[in-house]
Amino acid sequence: MRIYDLIAKKRDGGTHSREELESIVNGYVSGEVADYQMAAWMMAVYLRGMTDEETAELTDVMAHSGVMVDLSPIPGIKVDKHSTGGVGDKTTLVIAPIVAACGVKIAKMSGRGLGHTGGTIDKMESVPGTRTALTQEEFFAQVNRIGLSVIGQSEGIAVADKKMYALRDVTATVSCIPLIASSIMSKKLASGSDAILLDVTTGTGAFMKTVDQSIELAKLMVSIGTHHGRRVAAMITDMDTPLGHNIGNSLEVMESMDVLKGCGPADLTEVCLQLAANMLVLAGKGTPAECRAMAQAVIADGSAFAKCKEMFAAQGGDTRVLDDYSLFEQPAARYELLAEQDGYIVANDAEKIGSASVLLGAGRQKKGDPLDFAAGITLHKKRGDYVHKGESLATFYGAADKFEAAAAEYCSGLVYGAEKPEEAPLVYALVTKDGVERY
């Protein structure tokens, strides 16, 4: 079937066979299908949708467009975790060592930050000397030796997704649930883990803005993973306000270490405990309550922090900075953002805070932009807190000439009120193949 006919079929609401999806995706990767044809087809998908079966097949075709990682040289069940992204979302740096300290192998491939959301690999590289580009042999050997490695995602994984995402980004087809689900799950299937926990963030700092949208996406991704023989669960977590207090690369590493040392912010600690417990459940380690207790125990006895240091040391990192934060690269300047009035913080838009941190140099506005590892923001007041005029809302770190623009961006998402806003839950729901459990 010609690509023209396949575009017309989806435009008219038809359902594609696997062979048709292979023709579209593989044709696009090889160059036989032009950008304008792929853009037309994706817009047809955006407008007409896909069946769950169709989306599962598309995901598998996309996964097989590149390298399929075989983790069988690593014995035992391997559990992966993926977050749909957010501001101050440093959970991987906390939960990977917790789960590994509980005896479950973590062979994780993570990404870099783009736009207002940060990336795990950028955060890891703020620890001086840390290598995130390991060979497959080094990666497998480290996981077999210490039970944990987090590296940058291979360029060869889900090749179709890279091309399709870049095109979606410029053709107004990003916010399409079948295309989002196939994008995320194609990379997860290709990465080779036996079980996958999805952290689907929701709110202003997340891609999905409502809980219902997030649940719809989570159900589809769980269905795709289950269809392909993986154990999958998804947590719906809040991202209306950043997790923890720190946004920025080395700043988020410091805060993650605080959680592993048992002295981190309550919200970040709670979300990490729930994520870690659900990963352990997927690995068959026990009931949710038993697995939560295991996670708490390895924080309390110091073994989770020790495992994190062991990972950084194995990958060349200077682990002294994890104990003494003054050894991190220091910011060029600091700036205190002061409250302009008395009142409760009714809204503290996470996306605006993330964008402000990017303006300071903590993130990228386009691929390839250099990072200032010391740049970022520490929040002193968050949604629901009462502030007095002149009190510090946040400390900005970075080059002094960037503070004015960053402060304007931050304040554009700040709303004061006379009454304390209702507290939002940290976790809204758990989605498994058996259904949705709302909290």
Residue ranges and their predicted role:
Residues 1-88, 309-318, 433-434, 439:
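Acidic, glycine/proline-rich low-complexity segments that act as flexible tails and inter-domain linkers
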Residues 5, 17, 28, 68-69, ...:
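Well-ordered secondary-structure scaffolds
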Residues 14, 28, 46-49, 85-87, ...:
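Short, small-residue-enriched loops and turns at beta-alpha junctions
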Residues 47, 93-107, 187-192, 227-228, ...:
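Alpha-helix C-terminal capping segments
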Residues 77-100, 104-116:
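Glycine/serine-rich anion-binding loops at beta->alpha junctions
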Residues 106-110, 132-135, 150-153, 197-200, ...:
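General beta-strand structural signal in soluble alpha/beta enzymes
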Residues 123-149, 219-225, 229:
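A glycine-rich helix N-cap at a beta->alpha junction
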Residues 144-193:
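Phosphate/diphosphate-binding glycine-rich loops and adjacent basic-rich segments that engage nucleotide
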